[in-house]
Amino acid sequence: MNEPVNIRLLGPGTRVALLDGATVEIVSNPLDGVWLFARYLTSPDDPARVGSEEMIFAQDVVEIQGGP
């Protein structure tokens, strides 16, 4: 089991993996500890999401994959 990710530390450009297997790039972080705004880079369950921007719930973030 992975350690929880502290999303307050994540800035724009950081790539993270989500619970559903998708990968997103953070666009902005309101620093509320609950939400991130991110762009989908991959989405195995719904390829139509790739390129779209959505709010991501903190509990859906499972791993930091890289970034600035």
Model regions: which residues?
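Intrinsically disordered, low-complexity, charged/polar segments
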Residues: 1-2, 43-68
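Mixed-charge, Lys/Arg-rich low-complexity intrinsically disordered regions
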Residues: 1-16
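Acidic surface patches and DE-rich sequence motifs
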Residues: 18, 30, 40
